[in-house]
Structures are given as C-alpha cells and as structure tokens.
C-alpha cells in the first residue's frame, strides 16, 4: 500500500515539533509526518515525497512566514497538486488572505492558533474523508 | 475778558461766554456758530434749551445750578443739539466773577467742543473691547488646538499600538499554540505509558529489556534540535540503513530514532534493535522522552511569549514622573525590533552594527522607544517589507550616534522639507496621521539631540540621530 503523508509548514520550530507529534499521536503510524520552515521548502518536500511515491494528503500551513505567505503558497500547491487538502493554521487572521485561499486554493479549513487537538483532528479527518469520497 | 482774543482765535473748538447771575448772556464768542450752528444772538437766548435728555445732561443741570450761585465747579460736560440737529459734546469750565465788594456779578465760561475726542475715545474703547474678545477667542482656539494636538499624539500612539497588536497577537498565539499542543502530547504519552506499563514490566524478554535500557542511556539529550531540512536528510539516511538491515516498518523506526536524537548513531543502534517487536520498545522510550522533549518546547515557547510581553510592557509603560533615567540604548532599540519581529521576518534582513562600549545615556527611554518605533516602522513600510534594515550605534564619547538605514523607495527631493511638518503624510488615508516624524523631531529636540537624514529615490533612506550621553 502506498504510504500517506501530512505536511506542515511553519517558520517556528516550536510549532512544527509540537504539531507534528500531536498529529502522530492522533493519526498513529498510518501517516508520515513531514515539516518545512517556509513555502519554498514546503513545495520541495511535497515534490520529493511525490517522487518517492508517497501520497501527500493534507498540508497544514501557517500564514505569516518569511518570504511567500500561506495563501500564496497554498494557491501554488493547489495548482500543482489539486488533490491535496489544504488547511491554514495561523495566529493572525488575515481575512483577505483567507478569502484568497478559499477562492484560489480550495482551502479546506482555517484554524487559529492556539488550536485544540479536537479541532485539529476534526479538520484533518473531514479533509481525509473528502479524499476518500472522491476515491 | 482778558483772554477774549486768545479764545476767539481757537474758534474751531472753543467758544467763550459770560452770563449774569440771572442767567442772561452778556457775551458769547462768534465761534459758537462754527461749533453749534447758532448765531450769537440766537445762542444768547439760552443754550440749555438745546440740551438733549441724556443721563449725562441730568447731572450737568445740577452742576450748572450750583455754578450759577458762584460755587466754583470742576469741569463738566453736556450734550447739545446743534442747529442742524446733530449732537455735540461740550466740555465747560466756568468760573465766578466778583466785584470789589465781593458780590457775584457774572459767570464766565469756556466751552470746548470735545465731540471728536469723545468719538475717538468711544472708538478706542470699542476697539479695545473687540481686541479683548479676539484675544479670548484666540486663547480658546489655542486651548482647543493643544487639546487636538494631544489627541493626535494619542491617536498616533494608538495607531502605532494597533499595528503592533495585530503582530503581537500572532507572536503570542504562536507560543501559546505550541504550549497547548505540547501539553496535549505529554498527556497522551503518559496515558500511553500507563496503558503499557504492565507489559513493559512483566512481558518483555531479557533481550528487549537490555535494548530498552541501552537505548535509554544512549538518548542524546545534549544534541541541538534539528531544523526541518536536516531532519529530512537524516530520515533518509537512517531509513536506508534500516532497510538494508532488513527491518520492517522502517518509517516508524526512523521517526523514533530521530525523535530520540539518535540520528547519528544508526550503526550502533541497529544491532541493538535486532529484537522482537523493536517498535514497542522504541515507542515506550519515545513516550518517556516525550515529557522532556515537550517540556523543552514549552520552555522555548514561554521564553518567546515572555519576550514579546516584556517588550509590549515597555512600549506602553508610562512614566508619570517623566524624569530622565539612565538607559541602555541597545536594549531600547532591540525591544522595538522584537515588537516588529513579525513584520521584519517577512523579508527584511536586519544588520546590527553596534559599537561594543556604548555607555548608558540619560534620557526618557519610553519616548526614545517611540522614535525607534516610528523610524523602523517607516523603514519597513518604505521597503514594502523586503530589503535590508541597518541599525548602527556609534560611541562618539560625549554623544551617541544612532542611524537607521533602509533600502526602500527613498524620499523624493521635493518633499524633503515637508516630512517633519505636522499632518504631512505620504501614506494612504487611515494609515498615518502625519505626525509621526514631527513627534520624532520633538522628542529628539527634548533630548538636545540632533536629527538628520539622507535619502535617494529608489536607493533608500538613512536617518541619523545623535544624543548627548548626559
């Protein structure tokens, strides 16, 4: 069976470490967890995983990062990998950016920091079921 | 009639008269016609009947009665209708004339037309009133302006604060999010340990126990945390080694080894893991180490949040006494950089050229924070969030020089003189009040400092401030 992965992008290592462990705790070893510190690296990771025949199902991205912002990054991801479920996780709600991502990247959900594990679980699970329904 | 000729020569303003004790006029000088319009003979019939009924005249009639009895009166005034119907104010000085026997024979009087003088006085009085009123209005306006100015200064501060709050919200929500998730992780790990503790204590083989204890000792607590790129590199490396060694579920084992900081020790670890269900042993170690790892993460998050809160506290700190205090300029500036971190990190490289031996300076630190806030915020805006921000602090012995240079759009030559003017702004409505730089200049002047700037359109702007140490 093809391995599945969840990718997180955030410029703060404290977020990547805690979020990654949390996702692993929730979803177990069924999914791989990969992280990147900015948009550029995020895209690199997705491409690399895809090359290794690992299926990236969900991407959770911060909005405010050095370089490319979350919404622009997710739009780029959407163009190249339209099937990936896109989630934004950020401490500062920028409405314009969220709307941009909804409109142009089919943003699945927006979670604000600090988040609860229940919200995270629900959002990712609804995202995953979307993929399953599509087949 | 000693001075008859003299008085008649003053015909434009004076006339002279005398009357006997019965009030019959003995003489009225011809200038009465020039002044009042009446012929001498006509005037002799009596001037009192031409008096207006003003309040002034009512008093004057009393004075006249006394004067007629020979009692010397002070100069007095009355108002008369002229022949043409206009009103003139006449000032009278009367003196009684006695014969050798000491009997009163007549009253002599000098009448002075003071209409114009009275009018002038009236005008002056009116103008004085007007001036007084205008002065009061101006004072009120100044008070209003002062009020408005302090409101503007306040709203400028609030705007700067508002900008910061949006950023600070992010800066604080991030560590809180990390703390929250870390706590969740610790709870889950502990739950997992407790669920498996019986198995761990009673069901594992000697070999598994040995592996557990050996690996527990090997965990590299002192290793620095890996950045995501390094993590990916080691993941591949470790996984390949595990694959070659014939392990199953190498993804999971790799993740555990990375988690336990054993990423450089794969060659030593592989023989140890040649046991039954290595994943169970690694998972148990993972759960124990999770407490430490997440605690470290919480510690880092708390430090991050504290730094922001401290900077924020300093920013809004109001010293009511407003006394100068010895402050560290580097800290003062770095605090502002901390507060702008979220804007800076988007694409601005900060270069800090600080001299080593910067003495403490006697200043109003909270006001200087506003100076750096304004200048740094302007610089970030000028660079549209991308470029190089160079902050230099030089020790010039008696003075300290701070320069803040950006690689932004620059200030066009034609507005160089205007940028410190109040209400001058190049920002969109609502983005700036136009008093930021005025405030900066005022604060620098208050410190007896100096502010200069150099700017080239398309290349950038450098603001240079020098402040006295004492």
Predicted features by range, described:
Chain A
Residues 65:
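Receiver (REC) domain active-site loop signature in two-component systems and cognate sites
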Residues 20, 35-48, 70:
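Helix N-cap/capping motif at the beta->alpha junctions
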Residues 44, 71-83:
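Short amphipathic alpha-helix used as the core "switch/output" element in two-component signaling
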């Amino acid at each position: 069976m093809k391995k599945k992965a969840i990718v997180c992008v955030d410029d703060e290592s404290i977020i990547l470490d805690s979020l990654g462990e949390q996702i692993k705790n929730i979803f177990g070893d069924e999914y791989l967890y990969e992280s990147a510190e900015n948009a550029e690296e995020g895209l690199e990771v997705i491409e690399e995983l895809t090359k290794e025949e690992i299926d990236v199902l969900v991407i959770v991205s911060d909005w405010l990062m050095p370089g490319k912002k979350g919404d622009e990054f997710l739009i780029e991801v959407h163009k190249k990998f339209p099937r990936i479920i896109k989630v934004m996780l950020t401490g500062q709600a920028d409405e314009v950016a969220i709307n941009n991502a909804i409109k142009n990247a089919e943003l699945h959900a927006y979670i604000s920091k600090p988040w609860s594990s229940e919200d995270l679980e629900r959002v990712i699970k609804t995202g995953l079921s979307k993929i399953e329904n599509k087949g | 009639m000693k001075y008859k000729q003299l008085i008649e020569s003053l015909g434009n303003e004076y006339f002279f008269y005398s009357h006997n004790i019965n009030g019959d006029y003995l003489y009225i000088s011809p200038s009465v016609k020039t002044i009042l319009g009446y012929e001498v003979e006509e005037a002799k019939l009596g001037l009192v009947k031409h008096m207006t009924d003003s309040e002034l005249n009512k008093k004057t009639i009393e004075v006249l009665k006394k004067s007629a009895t020979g009692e010397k009166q002070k100069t007095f005034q009355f108002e008369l209708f002229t022949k043409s119907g206009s009103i003139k104010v006449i000032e009278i000085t009367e003196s009684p004339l006695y014969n050798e026997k000491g009997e009163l024979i007549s009253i002599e009087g000098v009448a002075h037309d003071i209409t114009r003088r009275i009018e002038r006085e009236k005008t002056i009085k009116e103008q004085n009133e007007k001036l007084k009123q205008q002065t009061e209005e101006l004072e009120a306006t100044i008070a209003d302006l002062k009020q408005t100015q302090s409101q503007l200064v306040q709203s400028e501060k609030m705007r700067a604060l508002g900008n910061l709050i949006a950023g600070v919200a992010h800066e604080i929500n991030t560590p809180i999010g990390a703390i929250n998730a870390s706590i969740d992780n610790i709870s889950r790990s502990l739950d997992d340990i407790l669920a498996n503790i019986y198995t761990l204590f009673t069901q594992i083989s000697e070999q598994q126990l040995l592996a557990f204890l050996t690996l527990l000792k090997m965990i590299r607590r002192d290793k620095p945390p890996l950045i995501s790129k390094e993590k990916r590199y080691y993941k591949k490396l470790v996984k390949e080694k595990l694959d070659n060694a014939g392990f199953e579920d190498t993804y999971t084992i790799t993740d555990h080894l990375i988690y336990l900081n054993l990423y450089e020790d794969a060659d030593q670890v592989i023989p140890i893991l040649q046991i039954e269900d290595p994943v169970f042993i690694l998972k148990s170690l993972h759960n124990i180490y999770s407490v430490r790892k997440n605690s470290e993460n919480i510690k880092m998050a708390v430090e991050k949040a504290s730094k922001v809160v401290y900077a924020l506290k300093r920013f809004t700190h109001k010293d009511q006494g407003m006394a100068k205090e010895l402050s560290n300029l580097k800290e003062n500036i770095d605090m502002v950089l901390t507060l702008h971190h979220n804007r800076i990190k988007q694409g601005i490289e900060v270069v800090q050229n600080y001299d080593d031996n910067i003495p403490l300076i006697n200043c109003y630190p909270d006001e200087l924070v506003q100076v750096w806030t304004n200048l740094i915020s302007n610089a970030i805006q000028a660079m549209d969030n991308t470029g190089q921000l160079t902050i230099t602090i030089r020790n010039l012995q008696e003075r300290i020089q701070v320069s803040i240079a950006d690689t932004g759009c620059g200030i066009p030559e034609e507005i160089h003189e205007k940028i410190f003017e109040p209400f001058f702004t190049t920002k969109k409505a609502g983005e700036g009040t136009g008093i930021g730089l005025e405030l900066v200049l005022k604060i620098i002047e208050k410190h007896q400092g100096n502010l200069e700037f150099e700017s080239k359109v398309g290349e950038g702007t450098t603001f240079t401030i020098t402040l006295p140490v004492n």
